[in-house]
């Protein structure tokens, strides 16, 4: 969603040509390409993963993090649809009213906060499960309560962001924009940016890294061979998360620094828009990497899909297996009889 800053009608006055530079046009084309790729790949992957995990829980017991991972993918699914609506509106393919713009922007920030925070919570739960040294299956009631509290907290954090959203009334296009028209609103907007930089960037990275590093060290100290697959999974998980989050934190800090010292120049406007463009892409990259890392790494999803298939189609599998066994036994008998006939033939 584009940001329109108009401080007492002075900032950006007469700078309409700044938004049509070749650099910004190229950046917007690249953003559209990346968004299209993530939308077309992430949504089908998330549907496959969530469906498989839900069906698997009907035939097998769940572990401590199962429901949390399912809600993580569900929030990623909602987030990608919010990205879709925001993209088609930004390209002016559809016009929205102010309420729908605020609703989409609110849901986007709420589920994004929930998704990134859930990654850190899953890390803490795995750490607790490891150190209790016993089977720790979370009760449905406590799991639901924790998910509800996190969802409520994420929604409360997202409320201030929706207050800045309006439709671009100057051009009458129905395009959703973050509109700031006073110095107090600008200061509040900057404060909200700082809070979300901490919620989306610093805090999850610290919690995630701390608990997974300890988790990895504990498994390595027990025996590396026994937990070789788990160690590989945790290392891939940690590496992929840090490769996204560390540049993300750096870009968030740069954006806050630029917004803290606004300038009425095309160069300043171009830098801020490019930073905001990259920031918009980072949650999409998380939504793309989460199914790949959490589900498709290590073959766990394949095993669960096979278990679901065997559970829902047992008769077919049994008859197929029996047919294979009978064919194999018949083949062995034919081989033995042929060998005996050849043995009894005269030379």
Curated annotation (Swiss-Prot):
<feature type="disulfide bond">
    <location>
        <begin position="101"/>
        <end position="176"/>
    </location>
</feature>
<comment type="similarity">
    <text>Belongs to the G-protein coupled receptor 1 family.</text>
</comment>
<feature type="compositionally biased region" description="Basic and acidic residues">
    <location>
        <begin position="322"/>
        <end position="341"/>
    </location>
</feature>
<keyword id="KW-0472">Membrane</keyword>
<keyword id="KW-0297">G-protein coupled receptor</keyword>
<feature type="transmembrane region" description="Helical; Name=6">
    <location>
        <begin position="194"/>
        <end position="214"/>
    </location>
</feature>
<feature type="transmembrane region" description="Helical; Name=7">
    <location>
        <begin position="236"/>
        <end position="256"/>
    </location>
</feature>
<feature type="transmembrane region" description="Helical; Name=4">
    <location>
        <begin position="103"/>
        <end position="124"/>
    </location>
</feature>
<protein>
    <recommendedName>
        <fullName>G-protein coupled receptor homolog U12</fullName>
    </recommendedName>
</protein>
<keyword id="KW-0812">Transmembrane</keyword>
<keyword id="KW-1015">Disulfide bond</keyword>
<feature type="transmembrane region" description="Helical; Name=3">
    <location>
        <begin position="67"/>
        <end position="87"/>
    </location>
</feature>
<feature type="region of interest" description="Disordered">
    <location>
        <begin position="321"/>
        <end position="347"/>
    </location>
</feature>
<dbReference type="InterPro" id="IPR017452">
    <property type="entry name" value="GPCR_Rhodpsn_7TM"/>
</dbReference>
<dbReference type="GO" id="GO:0016020">
    <property type="term" value="C:membrane"/>
</dbReference>
<dbReference type="GO" id="GO:0004930">
    <property type="term" value="F:G protein-coupled receptor activity"/>
</dbReference>
<feature type="transmembrane region" description="Helical; Name=2">
    <location>
        <begin position="36"/>
        <end position="56"/>
    </location>
</feature>
<dbReference type="InterPro" id="IPR000276">
    <property type="entry name" value="GPCR_Rhodpsn"/>
</dbReference>
<comment type="function">
    <text>Probable G-protein coupled receptor.</text>
</comment>
<keyword id="KW-1133">Transmembrane helix</keyword>
<dbReference type="Pfam" id="PF00001">
    <property type="entry name" value="7tm_1"/>
</dbReference>
<feature type="transmembrane region" description="Helical; Name=5">
    <location>
        <begin position="147"/>
        <end position="167"/>
    </location>
</feature>
<keyword id="KW-0807">Transducer</keyword>
<keyword id="KW-0675">Receptor</keyword>
<dbReference type="InterPro" id="IPR050119">
    <property type="entry name" value="CCR1-9-like"/>
</dbReference>
